[in-house]
Amino acid sequence: MHFTIQREALLKPLQLVAGVVERRQTLPVLSNVLLVVEGQQLSLTGTDLEVELVGRVVLEDAAEPGEITVPARKLMDICKSLPNDVLIDIRVEEQKLLVKAGRSRFTLSTLPANDFPTVEEGPGSLNFSIAQSKLRRLIDRTSFAMAQQDVRYYLNGMLLEVNGGTLRSVATDGHRLAMCSLDAQIPSQDRHQVIVPRKGILELARLLTEQDGEVGIVLGQHHIRATTGEFTFTSKLVDGKFPDYERVLPRGGDKLVVGDRQQLREAFSRTAILSNEKYRGIRLQLSNGLLKIQANNPEQEEAEEEVQVEYNGGNLEIGFNVSYLLDVLGVIGTEQVRFILSDSNSSALVHEADNDDSAYVVMPMRL
């Protein structure tokens, strides 16, 4: 195997692929990246057995075909440390990878390509194409609500659902829920649901960088695959049943609060400073046109903010985890935000003021 490549052309896919590779691995080959040269194309593959990413680069000069695996992090660090527009020469000699650039020479250990595991694929049961920016929006709007290391393993990921042409993302950790939908013109009669694990979602989001580009999605029985011109991403799915999110959405809330998102965000952030560090509870007191936000902590310290809001329901007092409210206000894009409440024991439903494609549910706290 032998090829030459510009530093930038190699570094971009190498950084993406190395992101999938975990530093501490049970199998040494999983710390490696698989390099394959075929014709005028170099492909780089990284995997942790859950998630697999293949990056592709077109080689400008003639290349000798071959395949080998080398330590991903070391190869990436070498590329990063080389000068910007240098030409890198890479060849395999006597089971070592020789990397030459300018006056620099590196020799890396290798493992055979045959040792490199591939993520098994079954047949795809649903294929569709969608703008990268749209899929990125679905992920960005909801990924913060995914659980981390929850024993209910099906919450450590995101539900992607195709139903009647609509693509929807849903994430919940049991305390709050985030949901975003968009019309994707996907020709699917049946409701189709998959749970993509947390790492898969976060890696996929990193790849969706082109504003105008499309991404092809294949949903299978056990895998999701996403393909663009430059990469192919595969992730195993979480085998489990996602909660019925529609039952979680509060119905019949009769108290509507409309406020300035940035004002509320700043007021919540300031109040949070003196909330209980462990439970993060704040108290909201609503009266005509006014929201009073209060927090206190075991040291008997107190914070209080008053924010003008549109509200004409009766007086209401309700407690929330301030971190959950700040997370929601952090992803909402409009200037105004709507809270729909019913009583002090019921969850809040949060929307953008003039847009219903996203919905957020936050459970109340007893204070």
Curated annotation (Swiss-Prot):
GO terms for biological process: DNA strand elongation involved in DNA replication. GO terms for cellular component: cytoplasm; DNA polymerase III complex. One of its GO terms (molecular function) is DNA binding. Keywords: Cytoplasm, DNA replication, DNA-binding, DNA-directed DNA polymerase, Nucleotidyltransferase, Transferase. It comes from the Bacteria. It is found in: Cytoplasm. The keyword Cytoplasm applies. Confers DNA tethering and processivity to DNA polymerases and other proteins. Acts as a clamp, forming a ring around DNA (a reaction catalyzed by the clamp-loading complex) which diffuses in an ATP-independent manner freely and bidirectionally along dsDNA. Initially characterized for its ability to contact the catalytic subunit of DNA polymerase III (Pol III), a complex, multichain enzyme responsible for most of the replicative synthesis in bacteria; Pol III exhibits 3'-5' exonuclease proofreading activity. Forms a ring-shaped head-to-tail homodimer around DNA which binds and tethers DNA polymerases and other proteins to the DNA. The DNA replisome complex has a single clamp-loading complex (3 tau and 1 each of delta, delta', psi and chi subunits) which binds 3 Pol III cores (1 core on the leading strand and 2 on the lagging strand) each with a beta sliding clamp dimer. Additional proteins in the replisome are other copies of gamma, psi and chi, Ssb, DNA helicase and RNA primase. Belongs to the beta sliding clamp family. This is Beta sliding clamp. It comes from Pseudomonas aeruginosa (strain ATCC 15692 / DSM 22644 / CIP 104116 / JCM 14847 / LMG 12228 / 1C / PRS 101 / PAO1). The gene is dnaN.
